[in-house]
Amino acid sequence: MKIQTTLLTVGLLSLPISATLACDAPETPEVPNGETASLEAMIAAQTEVKTFQASNAEYLACVDEQMATEQNLVDEGEEGAQERYALAAADYNAAVSREEQVAADFNAAIRAYKAANPD
């Protein structure tokens, strides 16, 4: 029984945090090289970035809800809730950082595109 419990615990810990939270993180879009991309590629990338940002907002709301639930469980003294809360908070912060990086990369691509295509 102890081995089964240990295996189950190890298995659960190896799951990505989004799987344990029932929140699906959006895929990060690829940003084209602005120096060589066509206008059509830049417009398509802009659409993908906007879609990513909207999906990420939904994801952050989901993680935020899970964090609130875990905080309530922490307040009730449930074992393991503090660790789950910390994992959710780290996941939330990583998603915010990922979105900031996508925005920075896309803005850099726009500047590079404009520099390469001054028309």
Q: Where are these predicted regions, by residue range?
A:
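Classic N-terminal secretory signal peptides
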Residues: 2-22
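Residues at structural and domain junctions
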Residues: 8-9, 38, 45, 92
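Processing junctions and N-termini across compartments
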Residues: 16-17, 56, 100
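Immediate post-signal-peptide N-terminus of mature secreted/exported proteins
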Residues: 20-68
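Compact alpha-helical subdomains of small soluble proteins
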Residues: 66-67, 71-119
